Regions:
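Conserved histidines in hydrophobic membrane contexts and catalytic metal-binding motifs
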Residues: 32
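Short beta-strand->loop micro-motif that forms the acidic, two-metal-ion catalytic signature
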Residues: 48-51
Length: 100
């Protein structure tokens, strides 16, 4: 059986945590993008997650979620709200997202 890639491992952890994240933080969707999706990550790369919420969080709760995800995955997470994407960069991000 082939060894799981870090991306696959992270995706599995996120899938398992989705119900809890939905309950605690009102997370509606999670999608990943960036260097891990392109298989260009380096040792110090962060893990980029695009998130939508069923109810917008406070800044404190958003940062707490980002920190909790970093702790769960064991790598720095860069959490981006889908609603806040700027059109110029957003179209590039949306081309490579992988839903969790």
């Amino acid at each position: 059986m082939p060894r799981q890639t870090r991306l696959q491992k992270f995706m599995e952890i996120l899938r398992q945590q989705r119900p809890t994240l939905a309950e605690q933080y009102n997370v509606a969707t999670l999608e990943v993008f960036g260097s891990y999706v392109r298989h260009e990550q380096r040792k110090n790369s962060d893990f980029d997650i695009l998130v939508t919420f069923s109810k917008p969080p406070s800044l404190f709760k958003f940062v707490r979620l980002e920190n909790q995800l970093s702790d769960l995955l064991g790598v720095k997470v860069d959490l981006v709200m889908k609603d806040s994407l700027k059109p110029a960069i957003g179209k590039h991000i949306l081309r490579e997202v992988v839903p969790v």
